[in-house]
Design a protein with these regions (language model features):
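Divalent-metal (often Zn2+) His-rich catalytic cores of metallo-beta-lactamase-fold enzymes
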Residues: 147-161
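Alpha-helical scaffold segments that flank or form the walls of functional sites
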Residues: 39, 69-71, 88-147, 163-170
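Hydrophobic faces of well-ordered beta-strands that scaffold small-molecule active sites
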Residues: 76-78, 145-147, 176-180
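Histidine-rich, glycine-flanked metal-binding segment
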Residues: 14-71
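Histidine/acidic residue-rich metal-binding segments in metalloenzymes
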Residues: 157-178
Length: 188
């Protein structure tokens, strides 16, 4: 089934000018179509004005009137560590007060705090926390994430974290690829 969003007050687009992606200053070139329309099924098939959309064959197309609404691309977060346990909020307060990361780590804090909490947590506990964070990201406009491990610091815990990353729901699994290690680096 295809859907046509039409009469969009502000349709925000990315002007890639035919490029597969854009970076740097080119990212400031944001387009806007007023009174826009967008046709999509599994992928975006057409973007233009609501007036131009009247030329589209709407047989078997669900039409949604978006009068007064803004439509924009979703955010992409390509580096998350959503599978974790514990909190280091108290360390943030110390950092704001002037403590260095090295000082906090020397006292057993830093990543070691998270490592211990992750190792002690069950897969179900880690999954519940990751699910909560993933749903929050989705509610705030992030449509694609990559979930990385990294807090286990040993093979067994890293594998546990990667398994949890594949359990979370809310995105299709192609949008939540686990990334076990940097390509070319040896696994231990």
């Amino acid at each position: 089934m295809k859907t046509l969003l039409t009469n969009i007050a502000s349709l925000v687009t990315v002007r890639a000018h035919g490029a597969p992606f854009i970076t740097g200053e080119a990212m400031r070139d944001v387009g806007e179509i007023t009174q826009g329309a967008i046709l999509f099924g599994d992928t975006i098939e057409w973007v233009g004005t609501a007036e131009e959309a009247m030329q589209i064959d709407l047989t078997d197309v669900d039409v949604v009137d978006c009068t007064g609404k803004t439509v924009m691309p979703g955010f992409v977060d390509s580096h998350t560590h959503m599978v974790f346990a514990g909190t280091r909020a108290h360390e943030f307060a110390r950092r704001v007060a002037g403590a260095t990361y090295a000082e906090i780590a020397a006292e057993g804090g830093g990543i070691l705090t998270t490592m211990k909490a992750v190792r002690q947590a069950t897969e179900d506990e880690l999954a519940a926390n990751a699910q909560r964070l993933l749903q929050s990201a989705l509610r705030h406009g992030t449509t694609t994430v990559e979930i990385k491990s990294g807090y286990g610091l040993d093979t067994e815990t890293e594998v546990k974290m990667l398994k949890v990353g594949t359990r979370v729901q809310g995105y299709n699994q192609e949008s939540v690829p686990p990334h076990p290690r940097t390509p070319g680096t040896p696994s231990t």
